[in-house]
């Protein structure tokens, strides 16, 4: 059976999970502190409903380097209106077991008031428009191309009217 079934995806996912789950006795408390307390407080403080005019949902968030979407519940609890997350790692966004889109779909089913969230493959080292992203990232799906155009515009001279209240970039700069 192994000769007839392509198992490369399974092994890739296992290898990927090992990287993300790698913790040591020294690193675990620091990781928990950073993910649990620091990130939560930043998100609640700067994206929370108290920052809006009416105190209800309202902040529009652009998340640079959203990875696997590990913070989307924090944004839900902060009561954001909408969220756009982008990351150059296609696998981190589309991983069926633990990717950002999978997490979003699961949470949207559980919580009917979960905000609208979009995820796309894009690279922050290039200008955020269709033309530059296509040249920088290269191959991408038609859906991703459409979202790129809808969210950031077709070229650097014609941007969309979409605006964001908060730019979030938690874990991207150290890479």
Residue ranges and their predicted role:
Residues 154, 164-175:
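A short SAM/SAH-binding and catalytic strip from SAM-dependent methyltransferases
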Residues 58-67, 84:
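Conserved class I S-adenosyl-L-methionine
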Residues 126-138, 143-161:
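Short conserved loop adjoining the S-adenosyl-L-methionine
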Residues 69-73:
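Glycine-rich SAM-binding Motif I of class I
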Residues 9-53:
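Class I SAM-dependent methyltransferase Rossmann-like catalytic core
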Residues 1-11:
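Intrinsically disordered, low-complexity regulatory tails
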Residues 58, 163-164:
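Local beta-strand N-terminus motif with an aromatic residue
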Residues 76-136:
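Class I SAM-dependent methyltransferase SAM/SAH-binding core
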């Amino acid at each position: 059976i192994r000769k007839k079934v392509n198992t490369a995806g399974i092994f890739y996912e296992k290898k990927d999970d090992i990287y993300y789950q790698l913790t040591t006795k020294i690193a675990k408390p620091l990781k928990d502190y950073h993910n649990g307390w620091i990130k939560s407080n930043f998100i609640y403080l700067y994206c929370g409903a108290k920052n809006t005019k009416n105190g209800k949902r309202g902040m529009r968030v652009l998340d640079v380097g959203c990875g696997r979407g590990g913070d989307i519940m924090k944004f839900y609890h902060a009561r954001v209106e909408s969220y756009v997350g982008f990351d150059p790692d296609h696998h981190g966004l589309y991983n069926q077991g633990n990717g950002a889109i999978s997490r979003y779909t699961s949470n949207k089913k559980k919580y009917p008031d979960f905000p609208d969230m979009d995820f796309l493959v894009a690279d922050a080292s290039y200008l955020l428009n269709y033309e530059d992203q296509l040249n920088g990232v290269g191959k991408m799906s038609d859906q991703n191309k459409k979202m790129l155009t809808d969210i950031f515009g077709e070229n650097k001279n014609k941007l969309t009217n979409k605006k964001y209240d908060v730019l979030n970039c938690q874990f991207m700069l150290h890479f």
